Every structure is written in structure tokens, then in C-alpha cells.
């Protein structure tokens, strides 16, 4: 588990450095969560290319980790270091002076982490009798994911083929399993790698969805409710649950620890799938894909709302605009001649100008 946490922390800091290219007014928590997603994607892409060329070995994975940390050179720029320091100071200021609102917010995030940990802890566990899962929905998916992971670590399955069907293309989004395989190759156990990855990506999804909802609605309460609706969604299975509880004559905890039926997918054919049990547990690639999509959607929303605000601004006098354009052209020619010798400044300027394009390429 320690190996996984160290690797994920390094990738998170690397991804955090990239967040300053496309996000200006976000909190440290948001940047850490976005960084864990972006850093994982970069590591997965680099590791995939390197494994296809040189094989999935320990040196290959280590070099992939080092290459994934290259975005940290962005902090060589004083402006980026200043932004990081400002974000850190703002985070420290928010933690000072505990009040009911801050305690409630901390309890919200802490409770979600505990729930995710307890839930994903049952995704896979090993005993002397073999490998088991705590959910019947995962009986088919867990062997599939294990097959994918071990096909990378033990079978050198590059370019990837479907581990279930020989000589067929691997059309399933395998990036999450490739990340797990990378952690396993560096010494982690499969269970620890899956658990750490699932919990951190799941929490990142919660934070990113909360912020995205707030951006759209402008309501912080809606932002807090949206992740709860996602995680604890479902149908009317709770009606059958309480019906059996009141008819059973047992106390609540005795009943909850000895459930007579599965109330998400019932034996009578009624299927009320929950996002946790039927999506994030079984189709674990969603834990990587959904938060990455939210990052892109939030940026799109910001771009569209900014364009709308620009349309509402007062119109510029045409003569003034022509004069400003001429001045801008002269300035651009002057700037190009004076910056030709400074390739680092040019590269930094390109990254700043094209940060949205770079974000879309990562997506």
C-alpha cells in the first residue's frame, strides 16, 4: 500500500502543476484531485507507449514514472511558483479558525472517504481458499480485470489483446488496469493497488463533480448534493429492504449484517442498479474517465460563459479597434524579433496560449 500511495502522490503533484495551465481560481483540494486524474492519465499513456516499444519491465515502468514527472519543470517559472504559494496560503487560511461550517465540510469529505474505503475494501480480498469479492455484481468483472492486469504484468500483452478472447482487439478501456499493473510491477500487491487507486479516484470524482455542479448552478448546497445523488443513486429497492426488516422481527444491525436478499438486483427480476455497485466497482475505468470528462466539461462551461459575458460588454469604436489592431501587430513583430533567442520563453508562452488545446489533447 505504501508503494501505491507514494506513486500516486508523485503523479498527483505532477498533474497539479499542469492544472495551472487551464484553471485559475481553483482551491488546493480541487487541484490535488484534478492532479491525481491528469497525472494518472499521463503515466498510463507514457507507460503504454514505453511498454509497446520496450516491454513491460521494472525499468520501463520506473522510466515512465520519471517522464510523467516532467510537468514539474513548470514550477521553474516564478509565476507558477507564486501561484502555487498563493494556493497554499489560501488553503492554510481556510483551515484556520474552525467553525461549524468548516467542521461540517470536513465531516462531509471524511465520511465520503470512509465510505469509499469500506466499500472498495470489499471489491477483492484473499483468503486461504482463494480470491473473493463482496458483491455478486463483481463476480464476472473481477476475474476480467485481474486477467487484464496479469496479462500486462506476466503476459507482456502489448499491443494489448483481449485477455478473454485470443487474437481479438482489446476494445475495453484498459487504462485503469494498466495503471494497476504498473503499481504491481513496482512491488505492490494487486489488492492494495486496486484499493488505493479506486478510493483516490473515487474521491477525486466527488470533488470535481461538486465543483462542476457549483459552476453551473452557483449553489454550494447543490454542489454537495450532486455527488451524494451519484454515489447513492438507485431505485425503490429500499422499499423491499424495509418491508423485509419490519417483517423479520430482528433489530436493525442484526438485519443489516445478515441481509436475506440483494436489494439492488433482486431475484424477482427487478433491477435497480446503484452507481457504486454496478458501475464503479465493476467497470472501474469509469473512475478514471468520469473525473477527466468533468475537468474538460468544466473548462468548456467556463469558455462558453466567458464568451457570453464578452458579448454583453460594450462595443468598441471601429476606429479605436483599427488603431489598437495596428499597435498590436507592431507589438507582435517587435516581440517576435526580441524573443527569438529565448526558446524557453517561447515554449512557456505557447503552453499558456494553447492550454485549452493541451487539455483537450490529454482528454
Predicted regions and their residues:
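Glycine-rich phosphate/pyrophosphate-binding loop
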Residues: 276-283, 292, 296-306, 310, ...
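Active-site lumenal/periplasmic loops and adjacent helix-entry segments of GT-C-fold
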Residues: 99, 112-292
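Alpha-helical transmembrane segments at the extracellular/periplasmic loop-to-helix junctions
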Residues: 1-14, 102-112, 140-143, 282-298
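Membrane-interfacial, low-structure loops and terminal tails that flank and connect transmembrane helices
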Residues: 79-101, 305-344
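Transmembrane alpha-helical segments
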Residues: 11-18, 45, 205-213, 292-304
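Membrane-embedded, hydrophobic transmembrane alpha-helices
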Residues: 1-99
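Membrane-interfacial loop-to-transmembrane alpha-helix junctions, especially the N-terminal start
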Residues: 24-39, 104-105, 221-226, 342-349
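Membrane-interface alpha helices of multi-pass inner-membrane proteins
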Residues: 51, 277-282, 323-363
Amino acid at each position: 500500500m505504501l508503494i501505491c500511495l507514494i506513486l500516486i502522490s508523485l503523479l498527483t503533484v505532477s498533474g497539479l502543476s499542469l492544472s495551472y495551465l487551464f484553471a485559475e481560481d481553483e482551491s488546493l483540494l480541487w487541484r490535488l484531485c484534478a492532479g491525481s486524474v491528469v497525472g494518472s492519465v499521463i503515466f498510463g499513456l507514457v507507460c503504454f507507449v514505453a511498454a509497446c516499444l520496450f516491454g513491460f519491465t521494472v525499468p520501463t515502468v520506473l522510466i515512465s514514472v520519471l517522464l510523467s514527472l516532467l510537468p514539474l519543470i513548470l514550477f521553474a517559472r516564478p509565476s507558477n511558483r507564486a501561484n502555487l504559494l498563493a494556493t497554499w496560503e489560501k488553503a492554510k487560511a481556510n483551515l484556520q479558525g474552525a467553525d461549524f461550517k468548516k467542521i461540517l465540510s470536513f465531516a462531509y469529505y471524511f465520511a465520503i472517504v470512509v465510505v469509499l474505503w469500506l466499500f472498495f475494501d470489499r471489491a477483492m480480498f484473499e483468503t486461504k481458499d482463494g480470491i473473493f469479492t463482496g458483491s455478486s455484481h463483481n463476480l464476472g468483472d473481477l476475474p476480467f480485470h485481474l486477467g487484464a492486469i496479469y496479462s500486462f504484468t506476466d503476459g507482456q500483452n502489448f499491443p494489448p489483446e483481449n485477455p478473454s478472447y485470443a487474437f481479438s482487439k482489446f476494445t475495453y478501456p484498459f487504462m485503469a488496469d494498466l495503471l494497476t499493473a504498473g503499481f504491481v510491477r513496482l512491488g505492490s500487491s494487486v489488492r492494495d493497488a486496486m484499493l488505493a487507486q479506486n478510493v483516490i479516484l473515487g474521491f477525486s470524482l466527488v470533488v470535481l463533480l461538486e465543483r462542476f455542479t457549483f459552476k453551473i448552478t452557483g449553489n454550494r448546497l447543490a454542489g454537495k448534493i450532486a455527488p451524494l445523488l451519484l454515489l447513492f443513486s438507485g431505485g425503490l429497492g429500499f422499499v423491499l429492504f424495509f418491508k423485509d426488516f419490519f417483517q423479520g422481527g430482528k433489530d436493525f444491525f442484526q438485519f443489516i449484517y445478515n441481509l436475506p436478499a440483494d436489494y439492488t438486483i433482486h431475484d424477482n427480476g427487478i433491477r435497480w442498479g446503484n452507481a457504486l455497485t454496478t458501475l464503479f466497482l465493476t467497470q472501474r475505468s469509469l473512475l478514471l474517465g468520469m473525473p477527466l470528462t468533468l475537468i474538460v466539461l468544466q473548462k468548456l462551461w467556463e469558455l462558453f460563459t466567458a464568451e457570453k459575458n464578452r458579448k454583453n460588454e460594450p462595443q468598441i469604436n471601429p476606429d479605436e479597434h483599427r488603431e489598437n489592431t495596428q499597435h498590436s501587430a507592431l507589438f507582435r513583430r517587435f516581440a517576435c524579433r526580441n524573443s527569438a533567442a529565448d526558446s524557453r520563453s517561447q515554449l512557456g508562452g505557447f503552453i499558456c496560449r494553447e492550454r485549452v488545446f493541451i487539455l483537450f489533447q490529454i482528454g
